[in-house]
Design a protein with these regions (language model features):
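ATP-dependent small-molecule kinase phosphotransfer cores
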Residues: 33-93, 118-119, 127, 131, ...
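ATP-binding Walker
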Residues: 13
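Conserved phosphate-donor/acceptor-positioning beta-strand/loop module used by diverse small-molecule
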Residues: 92-115, 148
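Walker A/P-loop
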Residues: 16
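P-loop (Walker A) phosphate-binding loop of NTP-binding proteins
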Residues: 10
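Short glycine-rich anion-binding loops that position phosphate/pyrophosphate groups of nucleotides
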Residues: 80-83, 104-106, 153
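Hydrophobic anchor at the beta1->P-loop junction of P-loop NTPases
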Residues: 7
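NTP-dependent small-molecule kinase module
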Residues: 2, 21, 25, 71, ...
């Protein structure tokens, strides 16, 4: 049995979209950790941050993520900040093949400019928030087994690149 595949990277980079496509092609189950959390708590991630705080969210995220990684035959889309958690990161690196989806901030900003569902984008100037978050996370994201530069690639090409690396390693 092959290892699970995890996708990490900034919010809005396309982890869920790419993950769904990969899971379909590889006949694996797709799991979006944020969606599981929302379903279990019956609140959006945004509302969880507002009502219960980031610390509560991160602890819940850790439990859900570790639980999902232990299951078999999964393509797992991690929350944007999940890889910052040492337990999640180390467990993912030991038990999955991990891919960092990387997209330049200008393109990321275009994707997120009208989003109301991103709890860490609090300023009117999304670019400043993104730069700050990216600076805090990029070194940690780089621990992933593979870095996939998504800048000029269509989703289908990103999917093919990841599947090729996943199957040939």
């Amino acid at each position: 049995m092959k290892k699970n595949l995890t996708l990490t990277g900034m919010m809005g980079v396309g982890k869920s979209t790419i993950g769904r496509a990969i899971s379909k092609q590889l006949s694996m189950r797709f799991v979006d950790v944020d969606k599981i959390i929302e379903k279990r708590l019956k609140l959006t991630v945004q509302k969880i941050f507002e009502k219960k705080g980031e610390a509560f969210f991160r602890e819940f995220e850790e439990n859900v993520t570790l639980e999902e990684i232990k299951k078999k035959n999964r393509v797992i889309s991690l929350g944007g900040g999940a890889f910052m958690n040492t337990k999640i990161r180390e467990y993912a690196l030991l038990n999955t093949k991990s891919f960092w989806l990387c997209l330049n901030l200008r393109l990321l900003e275009k994707r997120l400019v009208n989003s109301k569902k991103r709890p860490l984008l609090v300023n009117k100037n999304i670019r400043l928030d993104l730069e700050k978050i990216y600076k805090e996370r990029k070194d940690t994201y780089s621990y992933a087994n593979y870095k996939i530069d998504c800048d000029n690639l269509a989703a289908d090409l990103i999917k093919k690149k990841i599947i090729s690396l996943y199957e040939n390693d």
